[in-house]
Design a protein with these regions (language model features):
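Glycine/Thr-rich phosphate-binding loops that ligate phosphate moieties of nucleotide
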Residues: 1-140
C-alpha cells in the first residue's frame, strides 16, 4: 500500500519507498527475534539486492545496526555449499563451514542522523500494517 503520496512525488520516491518498506520488514523481523531474547548485532546481506549501496544504507539506518555484504551474491549456492561441507564431514559444524566460505566484502554503518525519521516511518508502517492486516487476509 502506498500511503501519503501526492502528484509531486516521482518514480524515484516510489522506488525508495519500496526499499524502505522492505527495510521495515527486516526491522520487524529483528524486533520479533528480540522479543524471543535473540539479539541481532548485524545484518548480513547477499543476493542481487546487496549490490545496492543505497538499499544497504537504508536497511542499516532503519535497523540502526551495521550491515555487511559478503563475497557471494548467490545465496542458494552458498547455503548449499555450507550444508554440503558439514554433511560430508569437511567441517565440524555450520559455523565453521560458513566462516570458511564467507568473507565480508563491505560494512555499512547506520547513519544516526536518519534515526528519527526512520523511527517515525517504522511506527507508521507498524500502524498501517496492523490496520490493514485483516484486509490482506480477505479475498475479493
Amino acid at each position: 500500500v502506498w500511503f501519503g503520496f501526492t502528484l509531486q512525488h516521482t518514480r524515484a520516491h516510489f522506488m525508495r519507498s519500496v526499499m524502505e518498506s522492505l527495510g521495515y520488514i527486516v526491522k520487524r523481523n529483528i524486533d520479533s527475534l528480540a522479543d524471543m531474547g535473540i539479539e541481532v548485532k548485524e545484518i548480513r546481506s547477499l543476493g542481487g539486492g546487496s549490490k545496492s549501496d543505497v538499499w544497504n544504507q537504508i536497511k542499516s539506518d532503519i535497523c540502526q545496526i551495521p550491515l555487511e555484504t559478503v563475497n557471494s551474491i548467490e545465496a542458494a549456492s552458498l547455503g548449499a555449499a555450507i550444508l554440503a561441507g558439514k554433511a560430508t564431514g569437511i567441517f565440524k559444524n555450520l559455523n565453521e563451514a560458513a566462516e570458511s566460505m564467507v568473507q565480508v566484502k563491505k560494512r555499512t554503518l547506520p547513519n544516526t542522523g536518519n534515526k528519527t525519521v526512520y523511527e517515525d516511518g517504522y511506527e507508521m508502517y507498524r500502524k498501517l500494517f496492523g490496520d490493514l492486516d485483516q484486509c490482506f487476509k480477505k479475498s475479493i
